[in-house]
């Protein structure tokens, strides 16, 4: 080919940078459009083709919106604190600050190679003090509002990583990072009270343009349940405990109680003969993660030797412990109704505990709705009636109360690692307090020894000079845990709008103009982690009066994974990783961008097909030859278009416009391929067709579009040239296919002119074999004809 993509791609990247083509306007009368990609962890392994699939959709939309009159903010930065960077530093012996900076430089270079239209003047990194100063500032807001607190809680402890992990960081009993075993141990931790926002987080999902599966994922994670909190007495003792149930109507079916092994009453109520068995069971449970306990199929447990008193009947009910009951959920104790709960039924069957039916059914366990039996004053009622009557009875007799509960737990927010934001908290003998705002940022000290300790003590605890804090003559001790990686990413979208502000995390004017994010693109794996945490922090900032919108991301789109050629997830261990730099060298950045867009729907996983990118490269070469010959000379002409080509050009502009708006990029490229084929068939190289083709190609293959735009003497940058308009009258079809009915029964179809008369339609219908067979030699007695829609011939 006459055009060398290596040369012109670098050329246009420089021209865009020199022209500051993609910098968002600080003040503008244009409507705003904030397109954001989830920023990457700057890992030493660099970016792979999957990252390109993440950033291409947002860039296509950004480029499209920019040339349609929007003031576009499309920034990029780095989620630079956290476990991945620190683990790599420990493995290599190089400080994480050094490895992270090197990785960021590598990421930036790769992203620029592919022509993403990021506003690089707004680049951020969460590990920079001028950024995490404001992460600490927001934490202080949480602390001041009582939403950040310390508490000894059972936590997910990873011995290999030597830190605690949040629930969303544990997958199948192992750490998300590295796949190391995780156990449950009690530790004093910082927690964020996300549970205070459970109802708002749940209800406000309805106003978001998000994939339904993601919204449903958050609904399930929040897990709202309406029911009753019922008080049980320990038989023969003064102690009481509570259970939460969504089925108070089944209270008469309770035949045993189960407590979590960690329940504070367990050791107190356990009888002497059962003490050893209970102690051993508690020790065994401590070795299991929460996920293991939920996933276990075989029910295990131990009888405590104690009994509860049924609050209505007064019956004695055995109290057991079992690891399928979690202290973190509900009250840490359950009333077991084995006749109507499969899990309780399995437990009762295994340990020969009585089973009682309180719902009419022919089989047990029966978990559906039926008429109440064996339930005294509830007998004969349906579920709704029985629940209402039982709730009234419990409240009138002070045995229980109505209650709403959530599965959502408070966010475990501290890590016993080095590479993270220091907490702006100092502990004194008489209590803890936040540092004054004018002392922010609390700088993460540079230390040589940053390896985590086996004891669970954070590495910063070994830095005595840093830990010591003087407030006048009062000595305190800095908090030595650090924040999790999710801290910086819970608000980064707000820093982009005003990244150089030294007086505040962002200005009120910038927030009011830019927020919320109009399009957020990222993976569905963040459903119950980052996406939930970002919503929580935004709502807190809204309550603080710092933001005017209580939801950060109005529209969310997920990109599917690019799988290896073998159909498996790309990984170095499988040897199926595709390097974007290699593709850029062999086929060009535009070919990769266009191929990613053409592979299939944005949200679907797609296997890498080497022959596919070859085909896309040929498609781009064919467009090039419509403009220049092999010597690089202009061959595009100024000839008029035939009516057929003119109509197809307008149809293609409309199709690509609509497809970009709906993020159906693969069908947009298909439409351009059809146009290119027709231009070659008609031997048409007119700029009246090729110029708009190049413009609608630009969001996908921006470098080539700029080069061809320049060859055709296009004004200014193609990346900023107004999007081509289409004429709807030229987009209308000349013919239409309509159904033909005889006496209301469909007999076939005809293709006729859009404006065909009734006589023309009837004549065409008579030529259809199935219609003619019914009509014979008769003429219709009545004709019902709606142009372009239906023809019904009535024959007596």
Curated annotation (Swiss-Prot):
Name of the protein in its database record: Leucine--tRNA ligase
GO molecular function, one term: aminoacyl-tRNA deacylase activity
Subcellular location: Cytoplasm
Keyword Oxidoreductase: no
Domain of life: Bacteria
NCBIfam families documented for this protein: leuS_bact
Predominant cellular place of this UniProt entry's protein: cytoplasm
Residue interval(s) of motif 'HIGH' region: 40-51
Biological classification of the source: Bacteria, Pseudomonadati, Bdellovibrionota, Bdellovibrionia, Bdellovibrionales
Single biological process term from Gene Ontology: leucyl-tRNA aminoacylation
Key words, A-Z: Aminoacyl-tRNA synthetase, ATP-binding, Cytoplasm, Ligase, Nucleotide-binding, Protein biosynthesis
Membership in a protein family: Belongs to the class-I aminoacyl-tRNA synthetase family.
